[in-house]
């Protein structure tokens, strides 16, 4: 059992890879094309001073279900919605493991479960677009599981040394960032959001990088923003193939 975490804020596949970046899987998303534009009725995360985080995330998750089920319909893979769990406060254990310290949200791989704490700095200190992005990122891990990317990544990581295993993990997380951008780009026109909102979200994403931390799990802020923007701009999951990217792009 693995937990794929989102921590709180404090290229094409047709060429040979450098040895340090060896691809664990031929990207099955490359042939799926552009995600269709869709409407996602974004509710207020706070209404009349009352936090409505659960209602907000429930609505967004339904949008993610709809968009990804439609997009993956032609991949010959069975689409299954993830289970969604909400917690008003951290529990001693979740998905059979200890609650991960400092996690904003996470995906339980074997149980295909999205876990959202409903309190904390990730909710309180950010634009409501950041919870939207976090939900889309964790859903990206669900897509990686559905398409077989996760299984092949874990197989490659199990055979790798410490440094390469960490790099593979960042490639995996940055791909989820990019997939979140694909979804955001596909629904952006329905959100009534402007350029300033997008820039604020990019700034929050840059600030969520692990540039200064000992734990190098999700990538530098600049790289997180790069992959988010790449997915948002192209709206093509195939553009999120982080596995052949140069090491500097996944640092």
Predicted regions and their residues:
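Second-shell loop/turn segments in exported
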Residues: 46-57, 119-130, 161-170, 191, ...
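Short helix/loop segments within enzyme catalytic domains
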Residues: 59-61, 65, 72, 171-209
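A metal-dependent hydrolase signature that marks the N-terminal structural subdomain at the beginning
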Residues: 3-95, 232-246
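Surface-exposed patches in mature extracellular/periplasmic domains of secreted proteins
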Residues: 69-85, 151-154, 187-201, 214, ...
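Active-site scaffold of zinc-dependent metalloenzymes
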Residues: 96-129, 145
């Amino acid at each position: 059992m693995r937990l794929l975490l989102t921590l709180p804020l404090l290229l094409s596949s047709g060429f040979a890879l450098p040895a340090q970046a060896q691809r664990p899987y031929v990207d099955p998303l490359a042939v799926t094309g552009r995600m269709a534009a869709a409407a996602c009725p974004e509710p207020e995360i706070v209404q009349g001073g009352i936090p409505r985080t659960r209602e907000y995330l429930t609505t967004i998750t339904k949008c993610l279900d709809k968009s990804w089920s439609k997009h993956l319909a032609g991949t010959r893979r069975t689409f299954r919605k993830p289970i969604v769990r909400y917690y008003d406060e951290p529990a001693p254990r979740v998905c059979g493991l200890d609650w991960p310290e400092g996690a904003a949200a996470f995906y339980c791989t074997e149980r295909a479960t999205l876990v959202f704490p409903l309190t904390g700095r990730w909710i309180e200190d950010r634009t409501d677009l950041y919870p939207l992005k976090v939900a889309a990122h964790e859903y990206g891990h669900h897509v990686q599981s559905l398409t077989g990317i996760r299984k092949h990544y874990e197989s490659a990581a199990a055979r790798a040394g410490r440094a390469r295993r960490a790099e593979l993990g960042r490639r995996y997380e940055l791909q989820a960032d990019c997939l979140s951008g694909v979804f955001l780009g596909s629904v952006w026109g329905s959100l009534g959001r402007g350029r300033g909102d997008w820039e604020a979200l990019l700034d929050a994403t840059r600030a969520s990088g692990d540039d200064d931390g000992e734990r190098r799990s999700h990538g530098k802020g600049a790289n997180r923003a790069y992959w988010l923007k790449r997915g948002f701009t192209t709206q093509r999951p195939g553009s999120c193939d982080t596995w052949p990217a140069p090491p500097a792009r996944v640092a």
